[in-house]
């Protein structure tokens, strides 16, 4: 149809040029010629009166009779020139248009009315090709150039009308189509892949990277993380939903988390304060500790010697460990690490289990008690017997 449009345009242009040759010529005034002849007659009469012997030249005198009625020439209204007779190309064009209208009416018939035989369609096609060829020949005979602009890469036929240059080839506009959906691309934008043309929709659907979150094609900016591609607005914390900033992200079980939520959810907790351990830490008692949190559970002093005592899951210094265990010497108040003597509900270093009066060591284990103090028998008798 594009070839037909181009041929019609050339034919119309040639018809307009032919019509311009029939121009309207303005008629001469009615009495212009008669007035000119009368003036010449009068002039010739006056010249004949002159005396050839008179040395003085005779001047011509023109008279005008004002009583005569003024005569004006009348200009006729221009008339349209009759249209030129139709050429054989125009007649053939009319026949072609009628034939096309008939074919279009037949195509619009409902499908359930039955398809026409293939031979009839081929006859119409052959007839149309023949008429197009004849029209092209007539235009050439009229001097109208019909040189093709190349051959269509799809149908391999000459291109006379509109042409599209793409992929290093020439195409009829209706033949330059998307490789996938077969829709006409025409002069619209398209994408090329492996020498084939695709409309933007199909190209993105087939070849654009997919967002790992929404699975939709990524058309603009793409973010690559965790061996996947994402829309920038879809790469956010799996817990709080905030988009990651310059601080980056942490990965756990193939899910991204912001630093705050990752540490709160997955970082080891301090055995003292139960907060996430972020930087320096101590490992003791099968858990981790902030250095400032690993102290005695009673006096909160750090373990400068590097040793501690564990009781009920908490660290203690030696003194408070023995105090809670009840293993402090009742005499000196220091922890008992070796042998001990238990008496009066207390524990003593052997050397500190002595008489409260004479300080004699009660090594034999025989003693007397008075007011929570230990005495040997002689001192007890001396001090408390009547």
Curated annotation (Swiss-Prot):
InterPro entries: Tgfb1i1/Leupaxin/TGFB1I1 (IPR017305), Znf_LIM (IPR001781)
Main location: cytoplasm
Region annotation Disordered: where it falls in the sequence: 12-51
GO molecular function: metal ion binding
Entry superkingdom: Eukaryota
Residues modified to N-acetylmethionine: 1
Residues modified as Phosphotyrosine: 22, 62, 72
Chain ranges of the LIM zinc-binding domain: 150-209, 210-267, 268-327, 328-386
GO biological process: endothelial cell migration; negative regulation of B cell receptor signaling pathway; substrate adhesion-dependent cell spreading; transforming growth factor beta receptor signaling pathway
Record motif LD motif 3, residues: 92-103
Biased composition (Polar residues): 16-26
Ranges spanned by the short sequence motif LD motif 2, renumbered to the chain: 70-82
SUPFAM superfamilies listed in its UniProt record: Glucocorticoid receptor-like (DNA-binding domain)
Compositionally biased spans, kind Basic and acidic residues: 33-44
Positions where Phosphoserine occurs in the chain: 19, 81
Residues spanned by motif LD motif 1: 3-15
PTM text: Phosphorylated on tyrosine residues. Phosphorylation on Tyr-72 is important for its inhibitory function. Bombesin stimulates phosphorylation on Tyr-22, Tyr-62 and Tyr-72.
PROSITE patterns associated with the record: LIM_DOMAIN_1, LIM_DOMAIN_2
Domain characteristics, as noted in the entry: The LIM domain 3 is critical for focal adhesion targeting and the suppression of paxillin (PXN) tyrosine phosphorylation. The LIM domain 3 alone or both LIM domains 3 and 4 can mediate interaction with AR.
Function: Transcriptional coactivator for androgen receptor (AR) and serum response factor (SRF). Contributes to the regulation of cell adhesion, spreading and cell migration and acts as a negative regulator in integrin-mediated cell adhesion events. Suppresses the integrin-induced tyrosine phosphorylation of paxillin (PXN). May play a critical role as an adapter protein in the formation of the adhesion zone in osteoclasts. Negatively regulates B-cell antigen receptor (BCR) signaling.
Subunit structure: Interacts with unphosphorylated ITGA4. Interacts with AR and SRF. Interacts with PTK2B/PYK2, PTPN22 and PTPN12. Interacts (via LD motif 3) with LYN and the interaction is induced upon B-cell antigen receptor (BCR) activation. Interacts (via LD motif 3) with PTK2/FAK.
Family: Belongs to the paxillin family.
Name of the protein described by the UniProt record: Leupaxin
GN (gene name): LPXN
């Amino acid at each position: 149809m594009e070839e037909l449009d181009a041929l019609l345009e050339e034919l119309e242009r040639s018809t307009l040029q032919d019509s311009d040759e029939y121009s309207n010529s303005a008629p001469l005034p009615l009495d212009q010629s008669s007035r000119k002849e009368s003036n010449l007659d009068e002039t010739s009469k006056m010249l004949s009166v002159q005396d050839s012997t008179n040395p003085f030249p005779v001047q011509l005198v023109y008279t005008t009779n004002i009583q005569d009625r003024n005569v004006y020439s009348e200009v006729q209204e221009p008339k349209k020139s009759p249209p030129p007779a139709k050429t054989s190309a125009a007649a053939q064009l009319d026949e072609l248009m009628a034939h096309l209208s008939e074919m279009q009416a037949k195509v619009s018939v409902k499908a359930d009315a039955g398809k026409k035989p293939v031979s009839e369609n081929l006859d119409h096609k052959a007839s149309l090709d023949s008429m197009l060829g004849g029209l092209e020949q007539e235009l050439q005979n009229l001097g109208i150039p019909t040189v093709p602009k190349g051959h269509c890469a799809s149908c391999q036929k000459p291109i006379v009308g509109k042409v599209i240059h793409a992929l290093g080839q020439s195409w009829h506009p209706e033949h330059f189509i998307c490789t996938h959906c077969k829709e006409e691309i025409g002069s619209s934008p398209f994408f090329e892949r492996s020498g084939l043309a695709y409309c933007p929709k199909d190209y993105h659907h087939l070849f654009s990277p997919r967002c790992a979150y929404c699975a939709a094609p990524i058309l603009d900016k793409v973010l690559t993380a965790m061996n996947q591609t994402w829309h920038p607005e879809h790469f956010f914390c799996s817990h709080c939903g905030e988009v990651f900033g310059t601080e980056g992200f942490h990965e756990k079980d193939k899910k991204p988390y912001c630093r705050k939520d990752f540490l709160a959810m997955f970082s080891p907790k301090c055995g003292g304060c139960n907060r996430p351990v972020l930087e320096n830490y101590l490992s003791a008692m099968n858990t981790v500790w902030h250095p400032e949190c690993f102290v005695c559970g009673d006096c909160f002093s750090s373990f400068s010697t590097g040793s501690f005592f564990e009781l009920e899951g908490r660290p203690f210094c030696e003194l408070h460990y023995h105090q809670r265990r009840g293993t402090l010497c009742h005499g000196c108040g220091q922890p008992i690490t070796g042998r001990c003597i238990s008496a009066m509900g207390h524990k003593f270093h052997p050397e500190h289990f002595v008489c409260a009066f004479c300080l004699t060591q009660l090594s034999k284990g025989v003693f007397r008690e008075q007011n929570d103090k230990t005495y040997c028998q002689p001192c007890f008798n001396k001090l408390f017997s009547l």
